[in-house]
Structure formats: structure tokens, C-alpha cells
Amino acid sequence: MAELLAIKWDDNRDKLILLDQTILPNKIEYIEYDTAEGVYDSIKDMIVRGAPAIGVTAAYGLYFAAKVAPEDKFEGFFKYLKEKSAYLDSSRPTAVNLSWALKVMESKALENKDKDVKEIKSILREEAKRIHEEDIEICKTIGENLITLLKDGVGILTHCNAGQLATSKYGTATSPMYLAKEKGWNFKVYSDETRPRLQGSTLTALELYEAGIDVTTITDNMAAMVMSQGKIDAVIVGCDRIAANGDTANKIGTMGVSILAKYFGIPMYIAAPTPSIDINTKTGEDIPIEERNSEEVTSRFGVWTAPKGVKVYNPGFDVTPHENITAIVTEKGIVYPPFKENLKKLFEK
């Protein structure tokens, strides 16, 4: 079966190649990018999605901006770079990896301010590639840490897509699933379809099915039923931003899943690369929540599913209270409550 990668880099042609996730699972098509404006649109329109993948994509986008910067003196060049960074950062406000990757790129330019601008552009190219490669290693390590919390025969529920399609490879929430498959484990995954954009059915189910993993798609409102039937031993989801106290922003519906998991006594694990942890955001109340187009809710596949003109509330994310989370699993280790103290310790290592 084919391996689906969300992000590819063509080193010879200096182009970013993204899998168009808006047309999955019906078509598998890749789109090439070589401008900051194109990258902005790819993030805004969800050609690429998932916090880690967005961060990697934005890093390449800022390199593309730097590449065509009109300034040859560092002061003017860096001002231009900061403007383009702010522009890219505005594409999707909730995913902290986006601003993290852009800040890393800005810092790399600043570290090399005494060098020729042409050389700095080359350095930024290599930095974007490094961020890309690092994401792959982070995801694999998260999987290695998470699999220690699971056992052969496990039933897993996941929500949205924190898989290979949301990262550079392996995924975060799906990483232990790929590793369990390699170990020959017999396990089952239930994938919430994740309305309104159906990332669970169109993306997670697709990539796991293509990988030969036993996956069953369920509607969002079936989660309580499958939990009550004893089919779920663990809930594993990704995240877009984790506050300093452990409150976690993830795709809309995750909070409801966490409440159900707590009720049924099922562990709730957050798979989180450390760039998704925002120590400067105190609680979930401080996380900006993106509101999306009303037509995502009122129409599907070109057909209206609600009255035209009806009011729509369509937040892209909700915040899972830290009290509902069993553990946050990162590439640096497994973090248990109390999260406020232990997340801080994670960054002191």
C-alpha cells in the first residue's frame, strides 16, 4: 500500500510539495509551492493541516519570502522577514507550532546578522529543512513513549487526524499505532469521523487503512456507545496548543470525548510535540479559538444540509480541561498531573 506523506521537499528544484488534503480520500494529488503567498493559502485553506505540519510548512514559506527579499542590508532584510512572518502567522491562529516555527526561523536569521544577506538566505533554507527532519524524529519518539502505556490487543479511540497526514511522518497520536503494527500487535482503532470537516473519516481512516491497520470509522455521536461496550481501552488524540496548566486545544469535539472517557474510566492521552506546549499561555481560556466558514456546517459535497441563511456557530477547536487528561506524552517523556509543575520541569531538562 502507498505511503501518504503530507509534506515533501524537492531539494533540486527548491519546491515544497504538499498533499491536497481537501480532496481526500477521493483523489490523491500533490501541489507544488515556491512562494510565501502560496504557502499562506495552503495553510488557510487547509490543503495542509495539523499543527506540526503547519509549522513545517510555514518554515518553508518564510524561506520562500526570504529568498525574494528585495533588501541587501540586514536591517531592511530582517524587517521584511518579520512582516512576512506576521503574515504567515495570521493564516491559522490556534496552532502554536505555526508561530513557533516562524520564531525559530527569525531567531536563526538574527543569529547570523553579521553575515551577508545572501548567505543568510541559504542558512534559512537549511533551517527549514532541519525543522522538517526534526519533526519526523519527534513523532517517532512520541510513539515510542506512548506505546509503553499500551498493550497487545488494545482498543484505541482517536479523534480528528493527528496522524502522518498532520505531521512530516508517523503522526503524533498515530505514531504508536504504526509502531504497534511493526511489532505485530493485534489491536483495533476506532476513528471518530470528526465533523464538520470529517478529518477522522477522510484522513485518519484513510492513512491507517492504507497502512494495513485495523480501523473502524464511527460517527462522533457513537463514541459513548463504543466506550460503554468495552471496546475502548485508551483514547489518544493530538493537540494544537497546550497551556501551561495542561488545558489542551484540539479539534472541536475533543472535549466531549474527554468527558466520556473520564466517565467510563478510560485513560485520555495527549500526544504532543514540545513545540505544541505554550508555557506562556496560562490556561485554556487564553488560547485563541479559530472560527471557520459557516458553509462547513450547512453544506456537504455541494448539497445544502441546513436551511440557507440559518445562523451557524463553527469554532474549529475546543479546549479539554486538564482534569480530564491522564497524561501528556512528548518526545521528552511522559508528563502526568500536576501538569502546571511537571510541564514546567519538562522544559528545564
Curated annotation (Swiss-Prot):
The lineage of its organism: Bacteria, Bacillati, Bacillota, Clostridia, Eubacteriales. Belongs to the EIF-2B alpha/beta/delta subunits family. DrdI subfamily. Gene3D superfamilies: translation initiation factor eif-2b, domain 1, Translation initiation factor eif-2b, domain 2. Keywords: Carbohydrate metabolism, Isomerase. The record marks 160 as: Transition state stabilizer. GO terms for molecular function: S-methyl-5-thioribose-1-phosphate isomerase activity. It comes from the Bacteria. SUPFAM superfamilies: NagB/RpiA/CoA transferase-like (SSF100950). GO terms for biological process: L-methionine salvage from methylthioadenosine; pentose catabolic process. Catalyzes the isomerization of 5-deoxy-alpha-D-ribose 1-phosphate to 5-deoxy-D-ribulose 1-phosphate, as part of a 5-deoxyribose salvage pathway that recycles this toxic radical SAM enzyme by-product to mainstream metabolites. InterPro entries: Deoxyribose1P_isomerase_DrdI (IPR043679), IF-2B-related (IPR000649), IF-M1Pi (IPR005251), IF_2B-like_C (IPR042529), Initiation_fac_2B_a/b/d (IPR011559), M1Pi_N (IPR027363), NagB/RpiA_transferase-like (IPR037171). This is 5-deoxyribose 1-phosphate isomerase. The active site is at 240 (proton donor). It catalyses: 5-deoxy-alpha-D-ribose 1-phosphate = 5-deoxy-D-ribulose 1-phosphate. Pathway: Carbohydrate degradation. Pfam families: IF-2B. It is an enzyme of class 5 (isomerase).
